[in-house]
């Protein structure tokens, strides 16, 4: 019980054996990047246990670690791999926990707000929010793009994960606020010798105009399909 909800628990022998008996070949984890509790939840004494509120793109969330050490995550991945089970991460690069213009200044806002986020052209105090979370990371800017690419390579090369599911992936394609041929981020992925070999899964929409992009992602990408999902629900 003391390991419940931790990386060590997922990598312990009884859990791995159970997954193998089920015939599981891949596990996809909800976001494990270091994240922040939403203010409105904290004020009610609640916690964000989904993780879609990223703070640090290179740090495993410590509340999921029994030991508090990065090695625990790597050991979990190694143990699952030894059982023939791949590990895919759900990643949230479309926004951060800094929220809208009233949110806390914790990372990119304090470094270079107008470079790392898509700011409103008419009033740069405000953000163009294509994510519904207060801000949108600006992958059209080379520094923001490099940050995300470096993070992905770190998790693939150092932490040895097998792939990524990209939350609100259309937001990663926005250039000048529009989804234009899925943007330079996807070109960068395709040209990267590490990332073009891992599994890539898109949630192919965001909340902005033109964001619904099911069927339009590049070769090598898998996509969630909400219409197929809804069709299955009808049976």
Please state what every model-predicted region is.
Residues 2-160, 165-191, 210-211:
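Substrate-binding/active-site clefts of carbohydrate-active enzymes
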Residues 160, 173-176, 181-235:
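Conserved alpha/beta catalytic core and glycan-binding cleft of carbohydrate-active enzymes
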């Amino acid at each position: 019980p003391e390991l419940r909800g931790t990386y060590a628990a997922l990598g312990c022998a009884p859990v791995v054996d159970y997954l193998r008996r089920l015939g599981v070949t891949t596990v996809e984890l909800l976001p494990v990047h270091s994240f922040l509790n939403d203010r409105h939840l904290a004020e009610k004494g609640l916690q964000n246990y989904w993780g879609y509120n990223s703070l640090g793109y290179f740090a495993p969330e410590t509340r999921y670690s029994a030991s508090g050490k990065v090695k625990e995550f790597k050991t979990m991945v190694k143990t699952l791999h030894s059982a023939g089970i791949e590990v895919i991460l759900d990643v949230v690069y479309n926004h951060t926990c800094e929220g809208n213009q009233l949110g806390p200044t914790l990372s990119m806002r304090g470094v270079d707000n107008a470079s790392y986020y898509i700011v409103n052209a008419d009033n740069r105090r405000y953000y163009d929010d294509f994510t519904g979370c207060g801000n949108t990371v600006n992958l059209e800017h080379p520094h923001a793009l490099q940050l995300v690419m470096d993070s992905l390579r770190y998790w693939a090369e150092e932490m040895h994960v097998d792939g990524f599911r990209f939350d609100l992936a259309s937001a990663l394609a926005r250039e000048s606020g529009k989804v234009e041929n899925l943007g330079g981020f996807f070109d960068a992925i395709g040209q990267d010798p590490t990332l073009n070999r891992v599994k890539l899964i898109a949630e192919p929409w965001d909340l902005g105009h033109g964001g619904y992009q099911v069927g339009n992602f590049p070769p090598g990408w898998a996509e969630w399909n909400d219409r197929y999902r809804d069709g299955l629900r009808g049976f």
